[in-house]
Design a protein with these regions (language model features):
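NAD(P)-dependent short-chain dehydrogenase/reductase
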Residues: 85, 108-168, 172-174
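N-terminal Rossmann-like NAD(P)+-binding domain of SDR-like oxidoreductases, especially those catalyzing
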Residues: 1-129, 173
Length: 174
């Protein structure tokens, strides 16, 4: 509801349709992406086009209009199955799925652009984001959404494994 923030629903794969939105801005908070593991296995080209080519289009739009700051919503999935918890940013990058690969390559692309075009960036490798609009239709990643759906339909919670697994969660407001 802030008057300082404007939301535009555009396709980041189309440079011509997005580039003029970057005129006169100070900072890009890049949240646009396809996100989900299973569909990325079924349609990897869609994920690569949106998450990599789309990110290049965001960066090119920034370059055209001399925008020098970007916050990128990356993904903890770039670590694959981490060797230790908690997982910090120095852990080995080992993406296991096209989604994870595409988000990590987006992060690398921003780092590369930052060197060439003197852009300041922060990349947030988010773990299991949840909130009021959490998806309830997938078993992977969106555990809280699945649990909410089970609760609202009076079904028991489904635990896969021995119940001792640990996951990090972050609320969308954080």
């Amino acid at each position: 509801n802030s008057k300082k923030v404007k939301f535009y629903k555009k396709d980041i794969k189309n440079l011509k349709k997005i580039k003029n939105l970057f005129r006169g801005i100070d900072l890009v908070f890049h949240l646009a992406a396809l996100s989900d593991v299973v569909p990325s296995i079924e349609k990897p080209i869609d994920y690569l086009n949106t998450n990599i080519i789309g990110t290049v289009n965001v960066l090119e739009s920034m370059r055209i209009y001399n925008v020098k700051k970007i916050i990128y919503s990356a993904s903890s999935s770039c670590y694959g199955i981490p060797r230790k918890y908690p997982t910090n940013e120095k852990e080995v990058i080992d993406p296991k799925y096209p989604y994870a690969f595409s988000k990590n390559l987006g992060e690398q692309t921003i780092a590369h652009w930052a060197k060439i075009y003197k852009i300041n960036f922060v990349s947030l490798r988010l773990f299991n984001v949840y909130g009021t609009r959490s998806r309830t239709n997938t078993a992977y990643g969106a555990a809280l959404g699945v649990f909410l759906k089970q609760k609202l339909s009076n079904h028991p919670f489904t635990i896969i494994g021995d119940g001792k697994q640990k996951r990090d969660f972050i609320h969308v407001n954080d």
